[in-house]
Amino acid sequence: MTPTKQHKKETFTHFIFRVFMILVGAASAAVSIELFLIPNDFIDGGIIGVSLILDHLFMSNPFLNFAFFVVILNIPFMIFGYKYIGKTFLVSTFIGIVGLAVIESSLHHVEAITTQPILATVFGGLLLGFGVGLVIRNGGSMDGTEILGILLTKKLPFSVGEFVMFINVFIFIWAVFVFGPEQAMYSFMTYYIAMKTIDAVIQGLDETKAVIIVSEQYDEISDAILHRLGRGTTKLKGKGGYTDEEKDVIYAVVTRLEVTKLKSIVFEVDQNAFITIMNTHETRGGKFKNAIH
């Protein structure tokens, strides 16, 4: 029986750096929400959007505020994320969401930066997108609807993007009745700007990424991806154009929430590995295994 290989775990220094970057992202999102969105009755999509609407509806109760709702509503999704994506994702997401709630609450008595709708839309969207993107780039998430989308679309004939958009349509329709059509339209513009900013921060919003890895340690890397990320790999035969040497090439498909973890795994095994990460237009067929890192 072949003994199970022991793989390196994330170093404490790298973990602290990730936590710092996640908190920077949470702070950016909190500033956007408290100083741009809430004063102008704007919302975002997903759990943040629902939390903003509920914050407005229960404004007479100081305890039922945005911070309360964004934590409570995300708890079920964090549990699902732990089960299907992994412990690292759970810890990163927990830090991001709690950080967002705490920082947003501490800004309650700070005056709004602007009440000009266009300025609030543009800069609120930019700050929110930057913050959420930074959290995702460092292995976490602030939006449970995307986690739910990743899980449900394994069994439903929809992409994650289609599922999230479907949910957000209902959230913005709800906003029309709560805030009025004009604020809902500004909110949609804010959401669009935020999504484009997230795209720029994490280099791609597709739910899955195709990854090609070239390394002399292809067996160990493939084994690490399987046992730490729970993803299968395909070994391809390649030949160097200059050296004419044959090489084994690893091909894998992962969700965008797993890209950070995959890169960490690869470079822990081989710092000289060559990685290419590509957006996939659509992924159909086959079965993703549950992540077990």
Curated annotation (Swiss-Prot):
Gene Ontology terms: cellular component: plasma membrane
Pfam family, one: YitT_membrane
Subcellular location: Cell membrane
Keywords linked to the UniProt accession: Cell membrane, Membrane, Transmembrane, Transmembrane helix
Membrane topology according to the record: Multi-pass membrane protein
Gene3D superfamilies linked to this entry: 3.30.70.120
Stretches that traverse the bilayer: 19-39, 40-60, 62-82, 84-104, 116-136, 160-180
Primary location recorded for the protein, binned into one broad class: membrane
Similarity annotation: Belongs to the UPF0750 family.
Protein name per Swiss-Prot or TrEMBL: UPF0750 membrane protein YqfU
Lineage: Bacteria, Bacillati, Bacillota, Bacilli, Bacillales
Gene name tied to this protein: yqfU
